[in-house]
Curated annotation (Swiss-Prot):
This is Profilin-2. One of its GO terms (molecular function) is actin monomer binding. It comes from Olea europaea. The lineage of its organism: Eukaryota, Viridiplantae, Streptophyta, Embryophyta, Tracheophyta. Binds to actin and affects the structure of the cytoskeleton. At high concentrations, profilin prevents the polymerization of actin, whereas it enhances it at low concentrations. Belongs to the profilin family.
């Protein structure tokens, strides 16, 4: 299965039980910041934004004072899982980033999708990739 298929079929799909509700953007990005696959709507990000995200996985709390920046958008960092998941909020939407052994699984949402639904979609794929040694 191609990385693009994972994005299209497992991240940009309808949320279970909520037909028509889906993430607004998603991507799988290598730890080095290289894009493995992304939706057409995923924002163009700067290398320093990805570096900040990777630093926060290695040093939890690093982004808390400044916020998480991706594609020029600033998200307030909210409760995540140290070293495993970073969550951010901006207005009625937000972002979830799950770290696997080799990649970051990223999902961005807006209402009517809830933070919990975004977490479920992103973390389910991230957990699967971890189980596969990726």
């Amino acid at each position: 299965m191609s990385w693009q298929t994972y994005v299209d079929d497992h991240l940009m799909c309808d949320i279970e039980g909520h037909e028509g509700h889906r993430l607004i953007a998603a991507a799988i990005v290598g730890h080095d910041g290289s894009v493995w696959a992304q939706s057409a709507t995923f924002p163009q990000f700067k290398p320093e934004e990805m570096n900040g995200i990777m630093t926060d996985f290695n040093e939890p709390g690093h982004l808390a004072p400044t916020g998480l920046h991706l594609g020029g958008t600033k998200y307030m960092v909210i409760q995540g899982e140290a070293g495993a998941v970073i969550r951010g909020k901006k207005g009625s939407g937000g972002i979830t980033i799950k770290k696997t052994g080799q990649a970051l699984v990223c999902g961005i949402y807006e209402e009517p999708v809830t933070p919990g639904q975004c977490n479920m979609v992103v973390e389910r794929l991230g957990d699967y990739l971890l189980e596969q040694g990726l």
